[in-house]
Each structure stands twice: as structure tokens, then as C-alpha cells.
Amino acid sequence: MTSKVVAAAASAFLSRTNELGNLQKSCIRILSFCESNSSRIGLHIHCPVIKFGLLENLDLCNNLLSLYLKTDGIWNARKLFDEMSHRTVFAWTVMISAFTKSQEFASALSLFEEMMASGTHPNEFTFSSVVRSCAGLRDISYGGRVHGSVIKTGFEGNSVVGSSLSDLYSKCGQFKEACELFSSLQNADTISWTMMISSLVGARKWREALQFYSEMVKAGVPPNEFTFVKLLGASSFLGLEFGKTIHSNIIVRGIPLNVVLKTSLVDFYSQFSKMEDAVRVLNSSGEQDVFLWTSVVSGFVRNLRAKEAVGTFLEMRSLGLQPNNFTYSAILSLCSAVRSLDFGKQIHSQTIKVGFEDSTDVGNALVDMYMKCSASEVEASRVFGAMVSPNVVSWTTLILGLVDHGFVQDCFGLLMEMVKREVEPNVVTLSGVLRACSKLRHVRRVLEIHAYLLRRHVDGEMVVGNSLVDAYASSRKVDYAWNVIRSMKRRDNITYTSLVTRFNELGKHEMALSVINYMYGDGIRMDQLSLPGFISASANLGALETGKHLHCYSVKSGFSGAASVLNSLVDMYSKCGSLEDAKKVFEEIATPDVVSWNGLVSGLASNGFISSALSAFEEMRMKETEPDSVTFLILLSACSNGRLTDLGLEYFQVMKKIYNIEPQVEHYVHLVGILGRAGRLEEATGVVETMHLKPNAMIFKTLLRACRYRGNLSLGEDMANKGLALAPSDPALYILLADLYDESGKPELAQKTRNLMTEKRLSKKLGKSTVEVQGKVHSFVSEDVTRVDKTNGIYAEIESIKEEIKRFGSPYRGNENASFHSAKQAVVYGFIYASPEAPVHVVKNKILCKDCHEFVSILTRLVDKKITVRDGNQVHIFKNGECSCKREETSFV
């Protein structure tokens, strides 16, 4: 009987009769014929039921209540329920179950309270629904009270109630209680076992889930397709072989491969990049639908197999299967991954044609695609603005995209707007906003978000905890970062890697290396993501021995082939003056990228092998590796140090005209330095005046340094004034200007400049040097000769060496102040305490002065020892009285 016929019959009959007995029977008969989508008929019946006072008839009301629930009219059903004068346990249970299925868990529990207050005794199905609502809310407290009622009413051994209770305890993390409850069940069936396995999988207890499956088989309980769907979910985390075993079990047991099970198998194989196996599952039987095909498309997308993903997408359409919102979302994700804006626009047009423009899933994928594929955020913002119901994923995608595009300030306004619209941000949203805080180094915002996380009790979650650590560390709040780490429930490599990265950025390289001990204390081993950070810290400290230990660790741990590790090793060996080792590591890189080549070119140039560095660059071009902005910074610096003026100018033009790389301020600084060292001050000034970017203080400082060397007082004063206008608290500008006045015969102006420094409470940046001896890094700071303790052992050793130099017949006498320079202290400490065969490697934060350079050079003539000093400009390798820089002392200006 069709809906229209039933509706017509109901209307005709009701208009002809007032006989209540017949009316009741007819209403029940009509309702029994109603189809699940015939809500209109329900309204036809409901009206006369109220009109003729038939709400006393329990069978009629229960039938009508069931009709409303079948047609998704849960709140209309609730209105009818409230109108009923007598409510049976069936009516209460049906309503509570409906709220539970609709995930209206709080409403289900509230209705249960009303039921208990009415004196109606719940049955096993009532308890099962109530317990499932408690599980949905993760409310173990209320669930425990319900459990007490279950025991009192004798339902604890019931498989339906017991399974729900086991699920509740599992979801609330009380696995011991869950297992004990399950063991007490009488005749646990397939559904009960599957629920327990599902709970364990949901709680990420993968091995325990497989163990339960094994016990299920031993108990002689046959698994069904839903059991295997859950087990495949566990296998995705346990490994390929586990999943293959489960697949074999499915075949051996003759479980029919329905669409749900096939989709789970496809998802499983695609996670392990076994797409050929996934396709075989797709073709294994005739039953297919859009969800199964979408799963295959998603698998190809996940594995970045663009051609196959698009081919499968087109094939499913040719078979008459209309892609759904998830299919289009997957294809748009592919466009995002391969940065294909044109194809993404085509898919966008298709979604509009087939009516998915209002789909939130498609909208989210479009926002992500436009953010990742466009140079601008405009189109993504337009799509977001047109969305009917943006959810938390929509807002989060937009926020993350804005962070990537550099619009970090806008993220905070979006977060406020999101909360205002009652969309609750999740941990990914907040992690994205914290990334914005890291870029801005905005500690106040970090504190605000941290407070919000504390109120929500999610500050200990690993994803958001890692973002908090990074945000605090980037804002120089290292103690706060450590407090977050200590409060986290779980920590991983990312937790410590972000901290090490920030320590390196802040110049706290010793602290970066100390993090290794904390990682090991947590049972976390360095991986290919964290190793480069520690190797970089070793490089910046000149800790060659530590760097070599990390190199050995990378080989033993199987990370020696990782490009990121090899690139960092090239940099480390170069900075430690061990160029042969750097070249050996470079040769191990299977396919050197631009970062690899930059490391080699930079290492050669900084160690004084300018010609070899330029040759390496030419080889890089021959190998068709495209240079980047950093490459040209390295080349310009090399030309500056090597006095290769014309070649430096040529590289600057090549960068712009051949490689279309727009020069940044840093490139102009080097260009000005090249011209300044060559005495071409007028050209250098012209570059500053005509550059398309606003010059910074460093450019004027570079020109001032050149003016000091060339004795150009008037231009030097002009550069100093312009530099101080931009950086009034930079002591280097005052010092350079004062030195220029001294050397130009203007001592009174020099003193006036130094007095101005004193008034502003500015002081010269202290020289700091480090030296590694027997795996431990020692630090030294330059001291004022008037304050130093001359009984200090290092000072005594320096004076002793100076006397030895005099006896050697060298004209070197040394500046008394220079005796306390940090580089000289570090060199002498390494000379005394390092093993006789070990070289001494020192790192200094400033350019090595003339006196210290001469001292170290003569020292290596007296003793057969290699001493390497890496200063703020280059690496100096001293051996047999000579330095690798091979430059006149003016280079130390």
C-alpha cells in the first residue's frame, strides 16, 4: 500500500465515522501500514487522536510514537510523549534509545531521571541505552550510579547491558573493570564480543583488541563482518602483516565481502601504500557503491598517485556512480597536495554543477586547495564566506592557511569570531593560532591561549602541548616552555625538536645539546627529524667531537641516508674546519638538492677556498640544480671576502636576470660590502639610494665600516647618522664612528661619541668564545684588563706563551687588553687541556681581532698543532704559522 493511498484512506475514514472503538482499531491498522518516510500520514492520524481523546490508548500512542521516531522526528515524538497520559516502559525506552542514537546524550539521561521519578522500572534495553549515553559523554560518575541500579535489578549478567557497561568502562580508560565485567557475562554473543573489540580499538589498545579476537575464536563465537571491520582498524596501526592475517581469516571463514568490509580493506591497504591490493579488493565482487570507489580514490590521493586517483575518479563516473561530497573532497585534497590550481578550479566548477556548493566537506576542501595553491588568500576567504554552515574544520583550515600566507595577525580575530559564533575550537585550531604567536613572538597571546587551554583541561594534550612549547621558546620564555613539557601527559620527538630548533635560533646551543639527556630520560630516541637540530647545535659551538658522535649515531640508527641529516653534517664539518669530512658526507647524498649544494659552497667559501666554492657552484648549475636566494647570499659573501668585486657584481645581476630571484636587503648588504672593500664608495652609496627596498641599519653600518677603512670622514658621518636613525641603540655604530674620528685626527669627537654611548647606557657587545675539550664545551668571555684577576691560570699561560714568542724572535709584542680577549683564552685552554694529537677548534661570536689572529698564527709556528677559529665572518685554519684566510690584516677591520 503506497503512502498516498494510505493517506487518502485515513482521511476518508476519519471523516465518515465517530465510532471510537472502530476509530482506534483503524488508526492502529493504518499506522502499521505506514512507510518510514510517511510522516504526513502520521500527522493525519495524530490530529484525530487528540481531537477524539484517544491518548489513553497505549497501543495507539506507542505506534504513533514509533512512527515519529522512524521519520527522524525526535522532537515531535517528544511532544507526543509528553501528551501521553500513561507511559509504558516501552515508550520510555523507545524515547531514551532515540536520544542516544541521535547523540543527544544529556537529553537521554534527563529523560531517564524522569522515568525513575515516575516509578516506571527500566528493562535491560533501557539500561543499555542509558549506559551508552554515559559512554558518549565519558561520564563514568553517572555511569557508575547506573551500574549500581543494574546490579540491584539483577541485569548485570545480561549480555546486552553487560556489553554496554564494558564499553563504558573501556571508553573511560578503566580497562581492568571493563574486562572483569565482560568475563562475568552470561553467554556473550558476537555483538558483545564485537563491542568489546570496538571499545579497545577506540581506546588505541590495538594488541588487546587482537587478543580479544583470539579469545573470541577459542570460545567458539563466530565473528561477523563488523568484527573484522574493527580488527582492520587495529591492523592499520599494528602493521601490514597483521592486516593480511585478518584478511586471510575473512576468506577462510567465508565472510561475504559486503561494501562495508571491502571499504575497510581498501582503507587498510592504502595506508600501507598497497594500492594494487586495494584495487583487487575493489574488483573482487560485483557489489560496489560510491563509498567504496571513494575509498579507492582517497587511497591514491593519500599516496600521491595523482594519475591513478584521477583515472579512478573518471572511471567511477563512467560506470554511472555519481561522486559524492567525500569523493570531491578527496580529489580537491589531491589538487592541494600537487599544487594544481587549474585542476582544482575545474573540480570547483563541477561541484557547483552537481549541487555540492553548500556541502561543508567540499567547502573545507576548497578553502584548503585555494590556500595551498594560490599566491593569495582572497579566493579561499571568498569560499569560506559563502559557506552555509562552516564547522570547526572550516575555521581551522582558514586559520592555518592565513598563518602559512603570513597573515598571522588576522588569526586572532578569526579565533574570536569563531568563539563568538559558538564554534568550539579544537586542539588543531589552537595549535595553528599558537604557530601565529610563534611567528610574532607574541607572549601575551600565548599566555591567553594557554589560560583557555587550562580551563578546557586540554593543555596536556601532545599536539597542543608541542605548539605551546614552540610558542613559549620562540618568545624567549624558556622556563615556561619547560613547565609545559613537564605538564604534558605524553611527549614525543616533536616536543623536543621544536625546543632544540628555538634554542638554536636564540643562540643557546649548549642548552640545545642538553635536551638529548631529557629525551633519553623520557625513553625517546633521536630520529631523522630531531638529529639535524642537535648536529646544528654542535656546528655552532664548534663541538666537532660531539658532532662526530652524532654522525656515528645516525649511521647505527639507519638515518645516515636521510637528506636532512646529511645536509646538517656537511654544515657541521664545514663549520668545524673539517672540510675533507664535509666533502665525504656530501658525496654520500644520493640526490643533492639546493640545501646540500648550499652547504658545500658555503663550507668551501668560509674555510677560505673561494675558488673551489665558485667551482662547486658551477658544478651545481651543470647538474641542473636551481640556485635559490640563499645560494646567492653565499656567493656574494664569498666574493666580498675574496675581493672579487666584478664577479660579485655579475652574480648580483645573474640572480635577478637569469633566475628571477628578487634581491632582499641581505643581498644588498653584501653588494655594498663588496663595493666598499674595493673602495668604490660612490657606487655603494648609489646602490643604497636606488634600491627598491627600504635600507636597514646593517647596510649603513657596512658602508660606515668601509668609510673607516678608506678614511672618508664626511660620508662616514652621514652613514652613521642614517644608521642611528634606524637603530639608535646599536653600540657597533657608535664604536665604528668613534674609531673613524680617532683615525681622522678628531679625538675630541671620538670621546664625545663614547660619552654619548655611556649616557645611553650602551656597552660594547662582549666577545664570547667556546672550545670543545674531551666532549665538553667550555665558554670564555672577553674581560676588561682593569678588572681581571691576573693570577688566573689562563692569564698566566697566555703571558708565558707571549714570553716564549719573544724568545722565538718574533716582533709580536701583543696588546695588553687583547690578552683577555675570549678567543685567546679559548685557544690557550684548548692548547693546554686537549690531547696532544687533537686539533683545537674555537668559535667566536665576533670577528677575530688583528692581535689574536697574529698570536694564534705564531703559536702554531711554535708547536705542531692545527688550530681552527671560526669567527663572525669565516673559518680561520692555522697551521705552521699560516692562516687559510691568506689576507692582509685589513680584512679584520
UniProtKB/Swiss-Prot annotation:
Alphabetical keyword list: Chloroplast, Plastid, Repeat, Transit peptide
One of the GO biological process terms: RNA modification
Ranges annotated as spanning the membrane: none
Region ranges (Type DYW motif): 807-893
InterPro entries: DYW_dom, Pentatricopeptide_rpt, PPR_At4g14850-like_plant, TPR-like_helical_dom_sf
Location of the region described as Type E motif in the Swiss-Prot/TrEMBL record: 699-774
Presence of keyword Transmembrane helix: no
GO molecular function: RNA binding; zinc ion binding
Keyword presence, Plastid: yes
Location in or out of the cell: Plastid, Chloroplast
Region (Type E(+) motif): 775-806
GO cellular component: chloroplast
Intervals holding PPR repeats: 57-87, 88-122, 123-157, 158-188, 189-223, 224-257, 258-288, 289-323, 324-358, 359-390, 391-425, 426-460, 461-491, 492-526, 527-561, 562-592, 593-627, 628-658, 664-694
Chief subcellular location: plastid
Family: Belongs to the PPR family. PCMP-H subfamily.
Stated name of the protein: Pentatricopeptide repeat-containing protein At5g52850, chloroplastic
Organism name: Arabidopsis thaliana
Taxon lineage: Eukaryota, Viridiplantae, Streptophyta, Embryophyta, Tracheophyta
Gene: PCMP-H31
